[in-house]
Amino acid sequence: MTQLTHFDTAGQAHMVDVGDKASTHRVAVATGTITMLPDTFALVRDGNAKKGDVLGIARVAAIMATKRTADLIPLCHPIGLTKVAVDFALDEAGSSITCTVRTETRGQTGVEMEALTGVQVALLTIYDMCKAVDRGMVMGNVKLLEKHGGKSGDWVSTPAG
């Protein structure tokens, strides 16, 4: 099993030194879903939410969050993102919205945390904008779908994970 990299030999937390790592193209894709009442889903789908364009604002929130990840996750490196793409898939039958965030950089560390942070903040933004009509919304199934680049190479989620 791979050792945890954010702890030194004495068990103290530290930020990993990536200074000697090669700068490579890195990509990460993460996803997550929010499920809501059918009436709430219709408000979002039709653009009739009282607070405005829910998905448009959630998209901007996700992009902003990816850029602030190092401010939120204590041992995460601040990195220069070269691309952030945010997509939403609406599932009317399930009254759910799936957010997918793709992050890219050319750097010495991966962008998985940025993609995951973007997804979470997008879902939280949807919740915030719709909570007046539906406090029972459920966010879940947040996960990394794939990552590419870097020393550890490529990784793609399996259906079970």
Curated annotation (Swiss-Prot):
The active site is at 128. Substrate binds at residues 75-77, 113-114. Pathway: Cofactor biosynthesis; molybdopterin biosynthesis. Keywords: Lyase, Molybdenum cofactor biosynthesis. It catalyses: (8S)-3',8-cyclo-7,8-dihydroguanosine 5'-triphosphate = cyclic pyranopterin phosphate + diphosphate. Its EC number is 4.6.1.17. Catalyzes the conversion of (8S)-3',8-cyclo-7,8-dihydroguanosine 5'-triphosphate to cyclic pyranopterin monophosphate (cPMP). Belongs to the MoaC family. This is Cyclic pyranopterin monophosphate synthase. It comes from Cupriavidus pinatubonensis (strain JMP 134 / LMG 1197).
